Amino acid sequence: GHFVYGHIDCVTPLIKIIKLENSWEFHFEKKFNKNNRFIVEKGSISINGISLTVAKVENKKFMISVIDHTFNHTNFKYLKKSDQVNIEFDYLARFILNNE
């Protein structure tokens, strides 16, 4: 995990959920303008207060993958397509990129 402070930087909609054999994929809209640079593959992000790793980044969306245990023990099991989620960007990434 990474440091999660509970600050909400923005919200974004969930656009797709895919159930795989032992995990779930959650696809979110990426519409953060200048903050898009904080979303990188294998980087950290907090969604609804949960520390997660970004699995894939595309031009207008990003995806995280969660194992069944994470799905069943977090609020992710209640999410539905079009739900708005709270996003907190990784503080260390933000600090480094803002001080280049």
Predicted regions and their residues:
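Conserved loop->alpha-helix
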Residues: 1-100
